[in-house]
Amino acid sequence: MPPSPGAHPSPDDGLEMIGLDTNVVVRYLTHDDAAQTAAAIRVIDALSQDSPGFLSLIVVAELVWVLEVSYRFKKSEIVQVLDTLLRSKELVIERAEIVAQALRNFSASRADFADCLIERSGKAAECQYTVTFDQNAASSAGMKLLR
């Protein structure tokens, strides 16, 4: 079960951060291209609490999609990867609390991670609900089916 980030650094803390694109994180996790993997390891291993890497919500969503579709990661592996990223002191994840909530929903349901993230983002924005034409998102991610 992922943490409920509280003391996680945020972009507003005045840290010297670098943004990480999805492909850098993918290379770091999969080691499928020797040269790019070496470069990704060099950058990510140099991160610290004072100079963390930043993962945007888009990178997190794209990472899940790439790992599922291109690398055939199982749901349990996706949950483990995201849980590890959320717990890392060397990473700042945009809206980490929403990512953690979406991960909990994803882990416990049949919903896609992106649907869980969309629904949790709507809740965080104080939406009454999120409408969708996707039957699975409505039944599994807590959205309202639009007919």
Label for each model-derived stretch:
Residues 1-17, 119-147:
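Acidic, PIN/NYN-like endoribonuclease modules and their adjacent C-terminal/linker elements
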Residues 20, 54-55, 93, 113, ...:
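Short beta-strand scaffold positions
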Residues 27-29, 66, 140-141:
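Residues that scaffold the ATP/ADP-binding catalytic core of kinase and kinase-like folds
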Residues 32, 57-58, 80-108:
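Acidic catalytic patch
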